[in-house]
Swiss-Prot record:
Belongs to the SLU7 family. Component of pre-catalytic, catalytic and post-catalytic spliceosomes. Associates with the spliceosome prior to recognition of the 3'-splice site for step II, probably during catalysis of step I. A zinc finger (CCHC-type) spans 118-135. A motif (Bipartite nuclear localization signal) lies at residues 129-169. The gene is Slu7. The CCHC-type zinc finger is required to retain the protein within the nucleus and prevent its shuttle back to the cytoplasm via the CRM1 pathway. Residues 498-509 have a biased composition (Basic residues). It is found in: Nucleus; Nucleus speckle; Cytoplasm. Its main location: nucleus. Required for pre-mRNA splicing as component of the spliceosome. Participates in the second catalytic step of pre-mRNA splicing, when the free hydroxyl group of exon I attacks the 3'-splice site to generate spliced mRNA and the excised lariat intron. Required for holding exon 1 properly in the spliceosome and for correct AG identification when more than one possible AG exists in 3'-splicing site region. May be involved in the activation of proximal AG. Probably also involved in alternative splicing regulation. This is Pre-mRNA-splicing factor SLU7. Residues 20-44, 517-529, 556-577 have a biased composition (Basic and acidic residues).
Length: 585
């Protein structure tokens, strides 16, 4: 234990003298140290009363010593306390009270006629000095003249509120201001009563009330409930209940005549969003924002136009959402091209720029269209009436039969072909397709089967006919030569095919063997050259400093071929071979 420790039990309270505060602490004996530890254990177990500070508050015995011990510069007497751990009053912020507020209005009646000590020497105001005065410097200041002393400035107090004071909506409210509204309503009520009394006096003087009282309906109690007199008497109630229908609660109905509230017990047919589709894989419902963006009936196969609710995503395509998205896209594109525009920073500038851009774009399209029409023509096709008018009702009378044939009126026009008609090229006298033979189309004038051929006339017909005769004669001779049976013909064909296959196999074997050997030799030569180049490259790299060598990751990693393995074996050095020294010679 250090010599600075003091027994809290034996320590006497400090009297406040300097001699007591400057005494050196006495060294604790072993017995005192043991008693102190036992007392601490008893306090922790609750068998002994806890320590008490100067304010009479109990000190928790479980607080560590490095927290509960008082520094020497705060209290040299070492009295048990936790005051040094609490917020110090001199460091606490002083907040304004709830009754304090800024001054409202300026007192204009008080006028100062005499210079006051400590005021501005130039104008005479008490709220500033001469160097801070904003008034024009006078030739002789107010300190010496004592005239034209300026009024004091309206200086507002510096208020500093806490968290709740800053958020108090009624802070600075004067309840006396509400009395003005009460007085105004009282005056209106008094004016209504005077007007009503004046009206009754006029009716009594004119005799209307006497006539109504002597009427037979009034005597037998058959007066109409909506008579003029009842309306006049209930005018005040009507004024009070004028806006009753506008402020009634949902599900309630306010009867202004009987002054009762009637519950509207109707059946609510609306369905909650999350109950429209109970499938957990359907549209997601966010309970925090009460939003369901997707359509809950998307998987049910229902048309969104026929459903009462199809999700909240329609809000994204209503109002100015689409135009704002187009403006944002234009801002991004303009910023990429060097224009300093931003949707949030300069919305007005961006809107004007976007409008001018659209006007210039339309003008450019019109100019481009006009230039194309001037160069190539075709304005008459653009001036044609729209398709709606072309297919509209006409005055032509047409009568049809049950089967769709025209009985009376304009007959149906013949459908035109999509191919060119009556177009004769290359001196042909007939069109292409006028002649057909053996599944082929041609020209009738020369019997030619080539579409873009030149016409040969009758000579072409004769040449075609002679070729056909020669072909037919040769086939006839072959047929007359050997009248063989089908079995013999089939056997001959098989023999010829076998001979051809044998010849092909022999030719393939001889050619393939020689070709394979040549290819292998070429591949091996290439692999040997590549291996020599690799060895030279390795030799160069080994001569370079280890830190300056390139990375191995730049080389391709693949499985080597047979030729590359053979070249590696042929070029590999074998130190165990006795003839290895003669390989380099």
């Amino acid at each position: 234990m250090s010599a600075a420790a003091v027994d809290p039990v034996s320590a006497t309270p400090m009297t406040g003298s300097k001699e007591m505060s400057l005494e050196e602490p006495k060294k604790m004996t072993r017995e005192d140290w043991r008693k102190k530890k036992e007392l601490e254990e008893q306090r922790k177990l609750g068998n002994a009363p806890a320590e008490v500070d100067e304010e009479g508050k109990d000190i928790n015995p479980h607080i560590p010593q490095y927290i509960s011990s008082v520094p020497w510069y705060i209290d040299p007497s070492k009295r048990p306390t936790l005051k040094h751990q609490r917020p110090q009053p001199e460091k606490q912020k002083q907040f304004s009270s709830s009754g304090e507020w800024y001054k409202r209005g300026v007192k204009e009646n008080s006028i100062t006629t005499k210079y006051r000590k400590g005021a501005c020497e130039n104008c005479g105001a008490m709220t500033h000095k001469r160097k801070d005065c904003f008034e024009r410097p006078r030739r002789v200041g107010a300190k010496f003249t004592g005239t034209n002393i300026a009024p004091d400035e309206h200086v507002q107090p510096q208020l500093m509120f806490d968290y709740d004071g800053k958020r108090d909506r009624w802070n600075g409210y004067n309840p006396e201001e509400h009395m003005k509204i009460v007085e105004e309503y009282a005056k209106v009520d008094l004016a209504k009563r005077t007007l009503k009394a004046q009206k009754l006096q006029e009716e009594l003087a004119s005799g209307k009330l006497v006539e109504q009282a002597n009427s037979p309906k009034h005597q037998w109690g058959e007066e109409e409930p909506n008579s003029q007199m009842e309306k006049d008497h209930n005018s005040e109630d009507e004024d009070e209940d004028k806006y009753a229908d506008d402020i009634d609660m949902p599900g309630q109905n306010f009867d202004s005549k009987r002054r009762i509230t009637v519950r509207n017990l109707r059946i609510r047919e609306d369905i909650a969003k999350y109950l429209r589709n109970l499938d957990p894989n359907s549209a997601y419902y966010d309970p925090k924002t009460r939003a369901m963006r997707e359509n809950p009936y998307a998987n049910a196969g229902k048309n969104p136009d026929e459903v009462s609710y199809a999700g909240d995503n329609f809000v994204r395509y209503t109002g100015d959402t689409i135009s704002m998205a187009q403006t944002q896209l234009f801002a991004w594109e303009a910023y990429d091209k060097g224009s300093e525009v931003h949707l949030q920073a300069d919305p007005t500038k961006l809107e004007l720029l976007y409008k001018s851009f659209k006007v210039k774009k339309e003008d450019f399209k019109e100019q481009q269209k006009e230039s194309i029409l001037e160069k190539y023509g075709g304005q008459e096709h653009l001036d044609a009436p729209p398709a709606e008018l072309l297919l509209a009702q006409t005055e032509d009378y047409v009568e049809y039969s049950r089967h769709g044939t025209v009985i009376k009126g304009q007959e149906r026009a013949v459908a035109c072909s999509k191919y060119e008609e009556d177009v004769k090229i290359n001196n042909h006298t007939h069109i292409w397709g006028s002649y057909w033979k053996e599944g082929r189309w041609g020209y009738k004038c020369c019997h030619s089967f080539f579409k873009y051929s030149y016409c040969t006339g009758e000579a072409g017909k004769e040449s075609v006919n002679s070729e056909e005769c020669i072909i037919t004669g040769a086939t006839a001779e072959e047929s007359v030569k050997k009248p063989q049976a089908l079995l013999e013909l089939h056997q001959e064909k098989l023999k010829e095919e076998k001979k051809k296959k044998k010849k092909k196999k022999k030719h393939r074997k001889s050619s393939s063997d020689s070709d394979d050997e040549e290819r292998k030799q070429e591949k091996l030569k290439k692999a040997l050259n590549a291996e020599e180049a690799r060895l030279l490259h390795v030799k160069e790299i080994m001569q370079i400093d280890e830190r300056k060598r390139p990375y191995n990751s730049i080389y391709e990693t693949r499985e080597p071929t047979e030729e590359e393995m053979e070249a590696y074996r042929m070029k590999r050095q074998r130190p165990d071979d006795p003839m290895a020294s003669f390989l380099g010679q």
